[in-house]
């Protein structure tokens, strides 16, 4: 009898081991595990460990919360009403999870790169030898970076492993489009979307190289007329060992590609990946962490974090209703979507291209900056379409606390004004109680280096980049979000330019001071009314390139006599300035198209040192000597401005010394 009972108990234990860890996370595979910095203790949470591996998921096709996933019902691995997929992860958690603060920061990695800990804490992104000041760990946070992009490039990229789709067992074909503006003469270009040293997405190879629907065009700027390049002048090929050989991932052009021109290609592709499962991965991992006590990173609260591409991903997750899990419960309790502007993205389409954004001279006319833009319902006066970003989450009662934060660049390069203004550009709009919008003035998309310097290669601009740091705002935002969700302590109020106050204006009203030798832009990015065919709202794009309708209005922050923006959250470098910081930087003539804006970059324009310098250069801005009688006076005013930011909870008190030091460094830099 005892033997029989033991056998039954063993069988029950075995069967339990086969059950999913949670309804939609079926298992977790840990590939590596180790203590952070040799077992060093971090605050009350003590020793932290870093884990890598893969999470396995399964979703029910019939569940209403999954039915927006494009082609889910056509997945090749559909079995018994379920579709399985998996995703890479990196987790950093207290070794004794009971010592954590209960809050999980769930990073949606930008093109597969886990970077939030390096950004917030400093040090190595992988904590290999340097954890910076370990702010996140000292404060007990858990951090997970989860793959969601199926085609992320790079050996270290965190990826989504999703099935392809077939229609009744037959191959699905379609048209795919890409574009590029070379920064130097090139004989060939790779298919896919690659930015800044090969980061991006591989996208799809050409399926039928000789199909007459494959086209290549060239034009001089975004809205210029396309010129068709004869098919005899180009082919899908690349040079290998001095010989031209066929390639399904490259285009070779006789005579080469010229810098400063936009080349756009359309070609036939096959076997679409069910890319929308990336939304399900983020959603279901968040729910798993909150509801399964045996989760690898158990949490009471989960905050989705995304920067740029992944900030757009989080905006789209909200819009498409993916913050409700399969049980209808809230997945993410808070969302920090940074530098997403007005964008969403190509995340849940047939033949989705998740790396594509909307840069000034590439990734043009993609389904990125598309209506609706505001969190509350609005109306497009041209199309008559109505809606808001939070419509579905509100109807499902799963709207999280939200920070939409942007820098000066997003108003010029990502149409950020559309998130808080009417679609006709004539008025401000009210925000949801769940939302805060923060505009960090003078910063660029990604913080530039200090001392300031120009970019390189395709990032070479006419001016040095804006060096203002985002790090300190990030730390305060995470602390504010945690307090808002945990104890309902309101965060700082929204801070952004407004039409009613005259601080959000048209390009014609932009009061830029005429600084000698500095070229200003005469256009800014905005949203387009696009038509990709009759089924594109259901995720199937059939017209490439799309039909383009009227543009949405372009509005930008107004500036003062120095060229610095009036409204928003102003670092002391803006309140007590030594320079002008902009959200734009024009392309250097050496890389072509010198009248166009660079992607991602702002400008740093120091004031003249003395009245004599000012007079010599005819600079309209006051000199440093006319503003400040001494270094001590400057630093005193700098500290006062900083203390006001700390009082208003934009900056943490512990970061005061580091920011004052930056003020000291900038004074030394501009007065040397």
Which ranges hold each PLM region?
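N-terminal secretory signal peptides that target proteins for export/translocation
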Residues: 1-5
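Bacterial N-terminal signal peptides
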Residues: 9-18
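Sec/Tat signal peptide C-region and signal peptidase I cleavage site
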Residues: 19-23
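C-terminal His-loop and adjacent cap/lid subdomain of alpha/beta-hydrolase
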Residues: 24-672
């Amino acid at each position: 009898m005892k033997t029989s009972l033991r056998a039954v108990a063993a069988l029950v234990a075995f069967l339990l081991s086969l059950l999913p860890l949670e309804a939609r996370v079926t298992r977790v595979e840990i590939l590596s595990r180790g203590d952070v910095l040799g077992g060093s203790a971090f605050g009350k949470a003590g020793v932290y460990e870093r884990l890598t591996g893969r999470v396995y998921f399964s979703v029910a096709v019939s569940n209403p919360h999954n039915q927006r996933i494009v082609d889910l019902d056509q997945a090749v691995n559909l079995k018994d009403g379920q579709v399985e997929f998996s995703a890479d992860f990196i987790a950093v958690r207290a070794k004794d999870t009971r010592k954590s603060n209960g809050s999980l920061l769930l990073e949606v990695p930008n093109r597969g790169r886990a970077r939030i800990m390096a950004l917030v804490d400093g040090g190595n992104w992988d904590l290999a030898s340097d954890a910076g000041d370990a702010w996140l760990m000292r404060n007990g946070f858990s951090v997970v970076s989860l793959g969601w992009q199926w085609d992320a490039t790079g050996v270290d990229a965190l990826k989504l492993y999703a099935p392809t789709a077939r229609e009744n067992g037959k191959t699905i074909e379609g048209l795919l489009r890409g574009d590029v503006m070379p920064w130097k003469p090139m004989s060939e270009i790779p298919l896919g979307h690659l930015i800044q040293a090969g980061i991006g997405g591989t996208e799809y190879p050409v399926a039928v190289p000789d199909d007459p629907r494959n086209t290549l065009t060239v034009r001089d700027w975004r809205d210029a007329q396309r010129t068709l390049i004869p098919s005899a002048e180009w082919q899908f090929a690349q040079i290998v060992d001095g010989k031209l050989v066929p390639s399904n991932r490259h285009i070779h052009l006789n005579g080469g590609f010229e810098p400063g021109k936009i080349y756009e290609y359309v070609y036939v592709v096959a076997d679409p990946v069910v890319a929308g499962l990336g939304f399900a991965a983020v959603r279901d991992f968040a729910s798993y962490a909150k509801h399964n006590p045996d989760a690898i990173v158990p949490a009471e609260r989960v905050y989705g974090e995304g920067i740029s591409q992944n900030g757009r991903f989080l905006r789209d997750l909200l819009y498409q209703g993916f913050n409700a899990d399969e049980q209808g419960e809230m997945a993410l309790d808070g969302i920090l979507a940074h530098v997403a502007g007005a964008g969403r993205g190509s995340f849940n389409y047939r033949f989705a291209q998740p790396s594509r954004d909307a840069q000034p001279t590439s990734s043009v006319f993609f389904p990125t900056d598309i209506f609706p833009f505001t969190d509350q319902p609005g109306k497009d006066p041209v199309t008559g379409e109505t809606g808001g970003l939070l419509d579905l989450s509100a109807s499902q009662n799963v709207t999280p606390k939200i920070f939409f934060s942007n820098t000066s660049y997003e108003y010029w390069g990502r149409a950020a004004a559309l998130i808080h203004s009417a679609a006709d550009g004539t008025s401000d709009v009210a925000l949801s109680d769940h939302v805060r919008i923060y505009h960090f003035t003078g910063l660029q998309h990604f913080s530039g280096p200090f001392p300031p310097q120009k970019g390189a290669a395709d990032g070479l601009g006419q001016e040095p980049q804006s060096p203002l740091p985002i790090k300190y705002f990030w730390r305060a935002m995470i602390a504010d979000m945690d307090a808002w969700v945990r104890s309902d302590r309101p965060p700082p109020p929204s801070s952004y330019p407004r039409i009613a106050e005259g601080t959000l204006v048209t390009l014609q009203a932009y009061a830029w001071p005429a600084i000698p030798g500095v070229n200003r832009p005469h256009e800014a990015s905005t949203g387009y009314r696009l038509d990709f065919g009759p089924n594109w709202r259901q995720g199937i794009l059939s017209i490439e390139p799309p039909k383009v309708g009227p543009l949405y209005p372009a509005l930008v922050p107004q500036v003062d006599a120095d060229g610095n923006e009036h409204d928003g959250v102003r670092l002391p470098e803006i309140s007590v300035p030594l320079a002008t910081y902009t959200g734009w930087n024009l392309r250097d003539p050496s890389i072509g198209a010198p009248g166009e804006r660079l992607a991602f970059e702002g400008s740093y324009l120091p004031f003249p040192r003395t009245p004599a310098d000012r007079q010599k250069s005819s600079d309209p801005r006051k000199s440093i000597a006319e503003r400040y009688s001494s270094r001590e006076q400057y630093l005193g005013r700098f500290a006062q401005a900083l203390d006001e930011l700390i009082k208003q909870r934009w900056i943490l008190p512990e970061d005061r010394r580091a920011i004052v030091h930056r003020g000291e460094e900038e004074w030394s830099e501009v007065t040397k």
